[in-house]
Amino acid sequence: MNEIDVGTYIRHCNFFNTLENGIDQAHVPFTHAKSNFTKFGLNWDIPKITAEETDYGVAMYGTRANGVARVNHYLMPNILYIKGSPESAKEGWREAFAWRVPVDDVSHRSFNIALVHVSGDAALRFRERQRLQEETISKLPSAHVMAAAALAGHLSVHDIEERPDLVNIQDHVAQEGQGAIPNREAERLGRSDTAIILMRQIWRRELRALAEGKPLKKWSRPGRLVATSGV
């Protein structure tokens, strides 16, 4: 038996901000240095990033210092598939998917779903924890309000480390803080940006072909994909 965890949010920046953040494994030890990820090793070190184009999009590999690689998948044009970290040591790693959908040039919505590997008493505890988290969040200022306060310098994200939605707030700050439509001309990309560079090259190639009336790549979804935790 498994449980399903679903969620959605709006982020006030171009949807490419979130697309790129999602495939950037190196952002985790920085943006989420203080988060639930620490318990399960996702932010313990900075991985070496490699990526390759596939029939479905991009496969990303983040190899840790111990030689173990975390494998994520980006399915063109807007799907991310990863192993999501558990919220409890008694849960397995989740099969997590996110669809990023533009609303307009300066905002987008993410639709998220995860298969949670729990059964029996663990499933009951999962449902109760979800209920309590939703109840707690409903009584707090919204994630958008807290992110805006952090970006304005009125508080630090370290002041709100106990919030159940901390990771979402951290991502709001990191992505909206780049600007609704970032100035990419000012960037200095490095080795950890390998997956981002590849994704941009693919989008540039496909959009150029579309503009010139040339055939686009026929992306195909594989029968089976495997994401790994890397820890």
Residue ranges and their predicted role:
Residues 1-231:
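C-terminal catalytic domain of Rieske-type non-heme iron oxygenases
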